[in-house]
A protein has these predicted regions:
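Conserved beta/loop motifs at nucleotide-recognition and modification sites
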Residues: 1-280
Length: 282
């Protein structure tokens, strides 16, 4: 079976037409965890969860133990569900061979799910490609990448509505610029902002006053204050960054980048380019 996308995975979960194996990987941690939980909640009957649900942390287990549980028959349910988080499957050729053998003849009554959170496999490596190929024989592989700014902003607008608050799409995009594009973090911020709005609108002022700024936003503020000559405010931001244990070289690099951009604009303007064309050269 070929790789499928997020929409196809949604359809499978909704229809209940499950495959015997799933591999979830990619950049977006929130989506991987979300769909792992969605599969579990749809497949596992809570009445018999103690018998039919087996969860493993890859740091603390062996593949043999995982596959033994995957061979078990379900009790009073259609499926035995085995969830494996962060198992370094591509590190061992022997593990890959064992997994290939299992997936080549996977039992129809088991759904085996591998997903990666803290562990970041090298998806371009020959070993991981073998893992993908093995999973495709018995099920589906889904690469969940970070969504576009527009998609995340729409999710935040809908999320605010579910929380009893209003959020304009442009304010949602501003929140992304302030707090970063990590969906799990953004939804945590949304919980806080919606509570503060108390059934009203989440405004730009509320975001400025309540949202936690990501590293990029804080460094942008630092650069802005340095360029404007506001040394006191710049030192306040710098102290906050040091309290966050940020590396000085990263901070220096980001601030230096602002001066490089200004120099590029100056050179472009000196070359007779208009303001809009000068910006293109940044």
């Amino acid at each position: 079976m070929p790789k499928i996308d997020e929409m196809q995975l949604k359809k499978e979960i909704k229809s209940g037409d499950f495959k015997n194996a799933y591999l979830l990987y990619g950049e977006e941690s929130y989506l991987k965890e979300y769909y792992a939980n969605e599969l579990k909640n749809k497949i596992v009957d809570k009445t018999f969860e103690a018998f039919n649900y087996h969860s493993f942390d890859g740091k603390d287990t062996e593949l043999d133990d995982i596959l033994k549980d995957a061979q078990m028959l379900p009790m009073m349910s259609e499926y035995n569900f085995v969830l494996v988080k962060d198992y370094p499957i591509e590190k061992s050729s022997n593990d890959i061979k064992l997994l290939e053998e299992y997936l080549s003849d996977a039992p129809d009554s088991t759904v085996l799910l591998f997903w990666f959170d803290a562990l970041d496999p090298d998806v371009k490596s020959a070993k991981f490609k073998k893992v993908i190929k093995a999973f495709e024989k018995a099920g589906n592989c889904v690469e969940l990448q970070k969504r576009s700014e527009n998609d995340v902003a729409k999710l935040l607008v809908n999320g605010a509505k579910k929380r009893g608050a209003l959020l304009d799409i442009n304010v949602a995009k501003y929140l992304i610029s302030v707090s970063g594009n990590d969906m799990k973090n953004l939804l945590n911020e949304l919980d806080k902002l919606a509570y503060y709005a108390n059934g009203g609108e989440i405004t730009k002022d509320i975001v400025d006053n309540m949202a936690t700024k990501c590293l990029q936003a804080r460094i942008y503020d630092l650069s802005k204050y340095v360029v404007a000559g506001k040394s006191s405010m710049a030192y306040d931001v710098l102290n906050t960054l040091f309290e966050m244990k940020e590396e000085p070289i990263i901070i220096l690099s980001a601030v230096s980048g602002v001066y490089v951009d200004m120099y590029r604009v100056k050179c472009a303007k000196n070359a007779g380019l208009g303001f809009d064309l000068a910006l293109i050269h940044i």
